[in-house]
Amino acid sequence: MECVKQLCRNHLCLDSLTGPVRSVLTQGTTAEKVQLVVSCLGVVCSIICLALGIAAAAVGVSCSGFAIGLGVIAILLGIVLFAISALDVLEDHGLVGCPFKLPCKSSPANEPTVQFFKGKNGSADKVILVTQ
């Protein structure tokens, strides 16, 4: 259990997620509340259907691999669409960025900068290209 807590603490930004959820529940319109609840239920139901589909395929139900593949793709697409719908509502109430911390951090690109130094008559006397 401690491992799960540590994983959630390290990879979930719950502070940035609970504020928008609370805002939707207290200040959101009925349509936003319904959209958020249905989106969450849709994600959960899609995950359950995905697990049942994989279990049925593992048991050996007489289905073709093509049908199973299409079913898995449809369910995964459902999960993504329901999650996007939920994030859409939360972004209207202050969610900024992804609520998950990515394991690898991207470093900003080191782009060169140009510095202009004016001469006596106002023209560019010296141009220095600075790279970092």
Swiss-Prot record:
It comes from the Bacteria. Keywords: Host membrane, Membrane, Secreted, Transmembrane, Transmembrane helix, Virulence. It is found in: Secreted; Host vacuole, Host pathogen-containing vacuole, Host pathogen-containing vacuole membrane. The chain crosses the membrane at residues 41-61, 66-86. It is a multi-pass membrane protein. The keyword Membrane applies. One of its GO terms (cellular component) is host cell membrane. Inclusion membrane protein probably involved in early modification events of the chlamydial inclusion. This is Inclusion membrane protein E. It comes from Chlamydia trachomatis serovar D (strain ATCC VR-885 / DSM 19411 / UW-3/Cx). The gene is incE.
